[in-house]
Regions:
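Positively charged n-region of N-terminal signal peptides that target proteins for export
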Residues: 1-4
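Bacterial N-terminal signal peptides
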Residues: 6-15
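Bacterial Sec-dependent signal peptides at the C-terminal "C-region" and cleavage site
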Residues: 15-23, 292
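Short N-terminal segments immediately surrounding and downstream of signal-peptide cleavage
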Residues: 21-40
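A short, compositionally biased
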Residues: 23-28, 76-78, 102-104, 152-156, ...
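Extended, well-structured beta-strand/loop surface patches
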Residues: 42-91, 97-188, 222, 288
């Protein structure tokens, strides 16, 4: 009887085949879209577990070619050509590695062979993309984490946090629209327009829209001034069609209202005479008529 009870108790502690298990380094994914460019990373997420320091020890030795994760190599994938840390990255999927050093820059490596185990780092090759990075100190992260902590209309920052170590690389994507415009291209639109709102609750409200050309950009502003848009970029999305781009306080465009808001100019004889502002469901939100 005692033997039967012992066998029954033992079976309680034997995991069933295929049952879920807690891993030392769980799989994590990170995905971010920036103006149509999708960046995806997949990686195992080691924990600190009281180990300090992490680098320059048997955990990650100096001059080691280390995958910033665990188990199978961390992967980086982009659906379009883009720039990472100043280096051009063709669209595709790569395994990611970092050469860690006691002083000076570290080196991020994107290798075209995706499926590699973390104990089998790649040899140096001409097909690799190498990006110098400077490790810094930041807030403590128990679990290794990849993220895009800040984003602009044309890029952002890719960052790894583990313990108090931060590795970050600037991201730049190819814009899907033309941000700049020459003076000759802008000339037909520059001027003042009587601007009349057509949708409730502002129906019939009038203001003046000023269209100018500054710093190789077509810009607009309303008088009285709109506290949110202030001075905004008019970004060409089709012939005579523009979407407003909103600036942050540093002068960088951080949001483009496409397709929520479209300025459609009517050009006759090389000069815009009027405009309509349409919503994404093609309703006329406002109209404008050129003033003398």
């Amino acid at each position: 009887m005692r033997t039967l009870l012992s066998l029954f108790a033992l079976t309680l502690f034997i995991p069933a085949s295929g049952a879920a298990q807690i891993r030392a380094s769980e799989i994590g994914t990170m995905s971010q879209m920036i103006d149509g460019t999708k960046i995806t990373m997949e990686y195992s997420r080691p924990r600190v577990r009281g180990r300090d320091p992490l680098f320059g020890t048997p955990i990650v030795r100096w001059d080691e070619v280390w995958t910033p994760g665990a188990n199978w190599a961390t992967t980086f994938e982009t659906n379009k050509d883009m720039t990472l840390g100043g280096q051009r990255v063709p669209k595709g999927k790569y395994s990611m590695w970092i050469v860690v050093r006691q002083s000076g820059n570290w080196t991020t490596i994107l290798d075209p062979v995706v499926r590699r185990y973390h104990m089998e780092p790649p040899d140096s090759s001409a097909q690799q993309i190498r990006i110098p990075v400077r490790p810094t100190e930041g807030p403590f992260f128990e679990v290794l984490t990849w993220s895009v902590p800040d984003i602009t209309a044309t890029g952002g920052t890719l960052a790894m946090n583990w313990g108090k170590t931060v590795v970050s690389m600037p991201i730049a994507v190819d814009p899907s629209f033309q941000m700049t415009m020459s003076a000759a291209e802008a000339a037909p639109y520059v001027g003042r327009y009587e601007y009349v709102r057509r949708l409730q609750p502002d129906s019939g409200q009038k203001s003046t829209l000023f269209v100018t050309h500054e710093n190789n950009t077509l810009k607009g502003r309303w008088e009285p001034n709109d506290p949110y848009f202030r001075t905004f970029a008019l970004i060409r999305i089709a012939p005579h069609w523009f979407a407003p781009g909103v600036y942050d306080r540093t002068g960088a465009i951080y949001e483009v209202y496409k397709p929520e808001m479209t300025f459609e100019f009517t050009v006759t004889g090389g000069r815009a005479s009027s405009l309509e502002v349409r919503t994404e469901d093609d309703k006329v939100e406002a109209t404008g008529k050129r003033l003398p």
